[in-house]
């Protein structure tokens, strides 16, 4: 499938082409077929370098072109969060009828960053999302799309319980956000989904 065939606004497709994307890889095509652009929650288990970040980007572009809510990208690591933030920040130049604002917050877990409520795409560590939920950040109710990277860590004895808890709380939001779970190494994808 070609980028030009996707059900996305022209500015989004132009952005993807400018970033060097013209065709989808099989995991991306499978995600589209599973309802990625239609608001369906999906689990993507695909090898490293198979285009999981593009899957996240496609979901974000689709969501932001149709909705006013917030997108949250969850990462287990600050370094990965910083890397993805710099990639997603490029989307700020896409004219989708509104100015897209991207922000990252991975620091102090006992504070609520008051500027996050003005952002459309928010990149967080799992622990920061947990802190924001516990401290009652009002914008959490506006989340419409959650992308959880490295979802296989849900089985980790140290980090798994936090990830499981925040995903459960996010699923229960009144806005019923679409959840895209990404992993390169998950072994029980059918059971987890």
Q: Residue ranges of each PLM-predicted region?
A:
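Conserved ASCE P-loop NTPase core motifs with emphasis on AAA+ ATPases
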Residues: 1-15
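Conserved P-loop/Walker A NTP-binding site and adjacent catalytic elements of P-loop NTPases
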Residues: 13-15, 19-193
């Amino acid at each position: 499938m070609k980028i030009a065939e996707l059900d996305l606004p022209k500015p989004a497709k132009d952005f993807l082409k400018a970033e060097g994307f013209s065709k989808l890889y099989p995991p991306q095509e499978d995600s589209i077929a599973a309802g990625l652009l239609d608001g369906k929650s999906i689990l993507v288990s695909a090898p490293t370098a198979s285009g999981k970040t593009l899957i996240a980007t496609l979901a974000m572009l689709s969501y932001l072109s149709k909705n006013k809510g917030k997108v949250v990208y969850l990462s287990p690591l600050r370094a990965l969060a910083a890397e993805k933030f710099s990639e997603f920040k490029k989307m700020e130049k896409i004219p989708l009828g509104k100015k897209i604002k991207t922000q990252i917050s991975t620091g102090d877990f006992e504070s609520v960053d008051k500027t996050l409520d003005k952002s459309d795409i928010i990149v967080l560590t799992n622990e920061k999302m947990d802190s924001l939920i516990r401290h009652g950040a009002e914008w959490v109710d506006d989340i419409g799309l959650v992308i959880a990277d490295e979802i296989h860590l849900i089985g980790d004895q140290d980090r798994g319980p936090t990830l499981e808890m925040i995903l459960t709380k996010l699923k229960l939001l009144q806005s019923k956000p679409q959840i895209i779970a990404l992993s390169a190494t998950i072994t029980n994808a059918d059971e987890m989904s």
